[in-house]
Amino acid sequence: MSRRRVYSEGTLAIMERFYQAMDACKAEKLISISDYCKETDIEKPHYYMQRKDRNRGFFEVGWMLPLVEKYHISAYWLMTGRGQMFG
């Protein structure tokens, strides 16, 4: 069980964009949550617990890498919220 964390507003905003990007990729049928969790070694319960409670403490920056490298989500957009999601 992960300890609760108090993330900064900036980190919470990045986390929110991560989940927005995941939803967009899922809607476009580019990924499934199960497959994404397997390929990134995210424990699926941690993915869902973190989504439900942003201060859960499971989130890692590495969760975003395949979105950028494989699914062409803009790293600039993930970090800043500016520009287009797909880059």
Residue ranges of each PLM-predicted region?
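Short, charged recognition helix plus adjacent turn
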Residues: M1-E9, Y76-G87
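A short, Lys/Arg-rich alpha-helix, primarily the initiator
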Residues: M1-K38
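Pre-recognition alpha-helix immediately N-terminal to the DNA-recognition helix
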Residues: R17-A21, H46, W63-P66
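Conserved hydrophobic/aromatic packing and binding residues within compact polymer-binding modules
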Residues: Y36, Y47-Q50, L78
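Recognition helix of helix-turn-helix/homeodomain-like DNA-binding domains
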Residues: D41-F59
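DNA major-groove recognition helix of helix-turn-helix/homeodomain DNA-binding modules
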Residues: E60-W77
